Amino acid sequence: MIIGPALTLAALIVMAIAAPWLGTVDPGALDPAARLRDLSPEHWFGTDLLGRDLYSRVIYGARVSLIVGFTVALLASAFGILIGVISGFSRWLDPVIMRIMDGMMAIPSILLAIALVALTGASMRNVIFAITLAEVPRVARLVRSVVLSIREEPYIDAAIIGGAGPIRIIWKHVLPNTVAPVTVQATYICASAMIAESILSFIGAGLPPTVPSWGNIIAEGRMVWQIKPTLIFFPALFLSINILAINMLGDGLREALDPRLPKER
């Protein structure tokens, strides 16, 4: 179950990296005389309202989506692990940290991201920051549960008796046990971040309109979707394939890394 999604995701990553060579023209090049062109050898996906080549914009959109998704997954995992470990080992900080995490999780992540972007402004950095902050509680609670499950294990007591300090215990016994669940969770966060970025851009609260993100392309195409449905179809198709591949990869990793799940024969 992992191979297919992994190959699909690898193809999208290659496409994003090779966007300058795969794109037929500059994704931001305007040509008013060529606006709303149909599919042709010159414009494989046609052109948009401003005469920009849709194929090139969709290709570059993969780069934007993957950068946001991977960066948010990495940052949310790092900060979530740190907060989760501190909460799991500190009996007096744990209630405070968990109430903060519960409060953040009580707010829908997309609404929290919209509020943060509205306060900080629309840019790639601010969008990544806003989505990361909304996703950190998911990792923090997961890591805390792992820490609580192993904190009372006999080998932890043996390590303490043997003179191991907190840092050594965390590094040698706690962090290795968080790798599998956090890796799986990171794939879901990556997909969630891509969807959040697309939603933010679609409603005008995300990346600037000049950035060729899939959300921006869909937002621009919705005005003429009845006469030019391809302006929405192609970016939505690539976004759907991307999200589906990452979620299926996460499911495959969960089945492979979680010994409690029954294995497929």
Task: Give the ranges of each region predicted by the language model.
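C-terminal transmembrane helix and the adjacent membrane-cytosol boundary/short C-terminal tail
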Residues: L133-A134, A180, V184-C190, P229-R265
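Glycine-rich helix-loop "coupling/hinge" segments at transmembrane-helix boundaries
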Residues: M105, L116-G121, I131, V146-V147, ...
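Generic hydrophobic transmembrane alpha-helix motif, especially the helices
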Residues: W44, D48, G88-F89, L93-I150, ...
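N-terminal signal-anchor/first transmembrane alpha helix
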Residues: M1-G28, I100, V179
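Transmembrane-helix boundary motif in ABC transporter permease subunits
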Residues: A19-L22, V68-D102, I114
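Amphipathic cytosolic juxtamembrane alpha-helices at the membrane-cytosol interface
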Residues: R52-I67, T71, R91-M98, L148-E152, ...
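Hydrophobic alpha-helical transmembrane segments of membrane transport/permease proteins
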Residues: M15-L50, I203-V211
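Loop-to-helix entry region at the N-terminal start of transmembrane alpha-helices
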Residues: Y55-G69, A118-R138, T230-L239
